Regions:
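N-terminal, positively charged nucleic-acid-binding surface of large information/translation enzymes
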Residues: 1-129
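Structured secondary-structure scaffolds
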Residues: 40-43, 48-52, 78, 96, ...
Length: 248
């Protein structure tokens, strides 16, 4: 889901679903080539996942952790990240160095700032929660500079899960994607029943460019939902080709 896929599909002259279906086919072929088997191929376009996400979003809204407002700032389409003026580096995305564009639209926000102190306490009480140490220090510095509430919906993006009580909005792709960790286990749906068996996760192994989502936004969401947190998050570096990050 998200604007990046929506725009790529439009450029290719196909629907977003048709566009991602082709990518899924190549990923499955890659697993065969690598002799990798799996119990279930999980996609965020699955109906059960949509059901779970809508329940999560509604619960957070009803308990006051999500509110409606207006987003005015910048957006990096490749990273799918929102940024303020002060966070940009030479006017560009601080994560990838690409151009950002101005964004101004009605949106819902998650009260990430409400959980800043709890997140810092989490890192202090559980020093192994974020690894390696250098990445943990980056996340602490990010929070201490002033944690902003997170824009969690878009009206300009149609390729996404609709907000159930305000369907002109679709959920921000990272709220959708992170929720997949527990929706695939059956949280918020009756399709699967593995949540108690497999959650919390022992480890999230993620690229360093998405560590912020996994160690700030995701734990804050879980705290708001009163759910257990993953035990550790490891932010690994990149495989490089010609001096640049290999695309995932």
């Amino acid at each position: 889901h998200g604007q990046k896929i929506q725009d790529k599909a439009a450029d290719a002259g196909v629907t977003p679903k048709e566009y991602v279906d082709k990518i899924v086919a190549t990923v499955k072929d890659l697993w065969k080539l690598l002799d990798v088997s799996y119990d279930r191929f999980i996609r965020t376009t699955d109906d059960y996942h949509m059901e779970s996400c809508q329940k999560i979003f509604t619960k957070l809204y009803e308990q006051g952790d999500i509110y409606k407002g207006e987003y005015i700032g910048h957006y990096c389409k490749p990273c799918e990240s929102f940024w303020t003026d002060s966070q940009l580096v030479d006017g560009k995305c601080p994560d990838c160095g690409r151009e950002v564009y101005d964004a101004h639209e009605e949106a819902y926000f998650f009260k990430t700032s409400k959980y800043a102190d709890r997140l810092l306490k989490l890192y202090e009480d559980n020093p192994q929660f974020i690894q390696p140490e250098s990445r943990k220090n980056e996340m602490i510095a990010f929070i201490k500079q002033g944690l902003q509430d997170t824009c969690v919906s878009r009206t300009s993006v149609k390729w996404g899960i609709p907000v159930p009580f305000d369907p002109k909005h679709t959920m921000y792709v990272w709220v959708d994607a992170l929720s997949n960790y527990i929706s695939a286990l059956g949280y918020g749906n009756e399709t699967y029943h593995d949540y108690d068996k497999f959650w919390p996760a022992d480890l999230h192994m993620v690229g360093k460019e998405i560590l912020r989502f996994h160690t700030i936004l995701w734990p804050a969401m879980l705290m708001a939902l009163d759910l257990p947190l993953p035990k550790r998050v490891f932010g690994h570096g990149w495989l490089l080709m010609n001096g640049g990050k290999m695309s995932k």
